[in-house]
């Protein structure tokens, strides 16, 4: 009988130990955010040359001639040709629509979009003015960026992780627990944002070019942000 009781006690201790071992340790799941502000050191400008003529050969020739003049004026400012590229080229017939539902061919339209990368931000206004003064009749976009974007994104990510760690430590202390280890890390997002109203830039460029005044350009500040979710294991 004593042997049976001892055996039963040992079995119960083993079961209790096994059951306790199967219960995962408690954890805290927190989110962290990191934000880094940076001054842009690169601008990407897209200008367009739109020409319309009755004859397809004439519209192609006129568009090519104007686009070449635009590109040459930009190169004259010191922009290397490797930083100038054709973003898009289209050639389409243009129709006139009548009240009776019919349409007639009214000519042809060619559009050549030129993309320019500018690493000297002091030249951004000059590039826009030169393009408009030499035949470009559209400014499609103006975006500011960073040449070494990864370094700023890495810093934002580091700050996001530290933010998550700080939150976990505060929560664990309030619970009377300690952080034991990191169980899981999830990087939610990491990006660079710079809101820019290119329509305003286009309007300013048109007005200032007509007035023979250099287009004023303010690059503002870029925001590099990152967010993470981190699960920390805490003491029992």
Language-model features: locations:
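Short, charge-dense linear interaction motifs
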Residues: 2-6, 15-134, 138-236
């Amino acid at each position: 009988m004593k042997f049976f009781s001892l055996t039963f006690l040992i079995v119960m201790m083993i079961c209790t130990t096994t059951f306790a071992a199967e219960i995962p340790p408690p954890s805290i799941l927190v989110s962290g955010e990191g934000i880094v502000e940076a001054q842009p050191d690169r601008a990407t400008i897209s200008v367009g040359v739109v020409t319309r003529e009755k004859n397809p050969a004439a519209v192609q020739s006129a568009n090519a001639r104007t686009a070449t003049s635009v590109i040459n004026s930009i190169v004259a400012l010191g922009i290397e040709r490797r930083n100038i590229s054709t973003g898009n080229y289209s050639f389409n017939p243009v129709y006139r629509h009548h009240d009776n539902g019919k349409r007639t061919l009214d000519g042809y339209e060619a559009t050549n979009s030129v993309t320019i990368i500018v690493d000297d931000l002091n030249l951004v206004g000059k590039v826009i003015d030169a393009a408009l003064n030499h035949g470009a009749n559209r400014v499609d976009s103006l975006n500011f960026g960073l040449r070494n974007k990864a370094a700023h994104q890495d810093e934002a990510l580091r700050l996001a992780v530290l933010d998550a760690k700080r939150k976990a430590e505060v929560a664990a202390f309030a619970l009377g627990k300690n952080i034991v280890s990191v169980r899981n890390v999830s990087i939610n997002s990491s990006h660079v944002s710079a809101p820019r109203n290119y329509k305003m830039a286009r309007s300013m460029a048109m007005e200032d070019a007509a007035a023979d005044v250099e287009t004023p350009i303010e690059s503002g500040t870029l925001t590099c942000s990152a967010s993470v979710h981190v699960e920390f294991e805490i003491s029992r």
